From Swiss-Prot:
One of its GO terms (cellular component) is cytoplasm. One of its GO terms (biological process) is L-tryptophan biosynthetic process. This is 1-(5-phosphoribosyl)-5-[(5-phosphoribosylamino)methylideneamino] imidazole-4-carboxamide isomerase 2. It is an enzyme of class 5 (isomerase). The active site is at residues 8, 128. SUPFAM superfamilies: Ribulose-phoshate binding barrel. Gene3D superfamilies: Aldolase class I (3.20.20.70). InterPro entries: Aldolase_TIM (IPR013785), His_biosynth (IPR006062), Isoase_HisA-like (IPR044524), Isoase_HisA-like_bact (IPR023016), RibuloseP-bd_barrel (IPR011060). It is found in: Cytoplasm. It comes from Ruegeria pomeroyi (strain ATCC 700808 / DSM 15171 / DSS-3) (Silicibacter pomeroyi). It holds the Pfam family His_biosynth. Belongs to the HisA/HisF family. GO terms for molecular function: 1-(5-phosphoribosyl)-5-[(5-phosphoribosylamino)methylideneamino]imidazole-4-carboxamide isomerase activity. Keywords: Amino-acid biosynthesis, Cytoplasm, Histidine biosynthesis, Isomerase.
Length: 247
């Protein structure tokens, strides 16, 4: 299981959001470049970067995102506002290791299928779930898709992974989140990355034993220092070794 240390950028600053609320960010007084360098030094294989300004439809973080991709010593999985072919291919050309797509997949599934085939193992599907439906536009619009139907619509598409987020459950309701994510991981042929689940070490241990969970985004816990990246990576690696012994 891959641990993806996660950074969210708003107005050039590192933040975390409560249930995706762009108007009420928690600001972290850290240097983005030093933070990313520390993650690479700790042994991270990937990082996840969300441009919240792009989610809101502005381009204020574009230069910073480009610099992070260029300077990071690990590949970057980039999310936020990927709503056109041009934008997706722009960031692939700029060196993003993977691009995360949600809203565009709901609006133009055929285009997303084409992009995934053109860029194998570089496109990630985002499935954000609220009240039994997939949300789009930065969690502000509800689509007609159930998460199962959304995943089924892309069953044979060569995505690198599917990121699943349970918006419904409160940040502390990890059992409910695990239930939804575990069910969708079982439903999907594509490996699933869990988002919004990890508060501490125990959550990583539990995730590691869920079939078809290939990774976890870890952001708030790292910034709060309720979990160190070194511990997260170690737990994920040792749990994977134990799972392999039983297979």
């Amino acid at each position: 299981m891959i641990i993806y240390p996660t950074m969210e950028l708003q107005n050039g600053r590192c933040v975390t959001l409560e249930r995706g609320r762009l108007d009420a960010p928690m600001l972290w007084h850290v240097d983005p470049f030093e933070t990313v360098s520390g993650w690479a030094s700790a042994g991270a294989e990937w990082m996840h970067l969300t441009d919240l300004d792009a989610v809101a439809g502005t381009s204020g973080n574009a230069e910073l995102v480009e610099q992070i991709i260029r300077k990071a010593e690990i590949p970057v999985q980039l999310a936020g506002g990927m709503r056109s072919r041009e934008r997706i291919e722009h960031w692939i050309d700029k060196g993003a290791g993977r691009i995360v797509i949600g809203t565009l997949a709901a609006r133009d599934p055929e285009l997303v299928k084409e992009l995934a085939k053109r860029h194998p193992d570089q496109i990630v599907l985002s499935v954000d779930v609220w009240q039994g439906h997939v949300m789009t536009d930065g969690w502000r619009s509800q689509s007609a898709y159930t998460p199962e139907a959304f995943i089924d619509a892309f069953a044979d598409v060569p995505f690198a992974a599917i990121v699943v987020t349970d918006i419904d459950s409160d940040v502390e309701e990890v059992e409910a989140k695990l239930g939804l994510i575990s069910g969708l991981a079982a439903h999907s042929r594509t490996p699933v990355i869990a988002s919004g689940v990890v508060r501490g070490a125990d959550d990583i241990s539990r995730l590691a034993y869920v079939p078809n969970i290939a990774g976890a985004l870890v952001g708030r816990a790292l910034f709060r220092k309720s979990l160190s990246l070194e511990d997260a990576l170690s737990i994920a690696a040792s749990a994977h070794e134990r799972v392999a012994q039983f297979q």
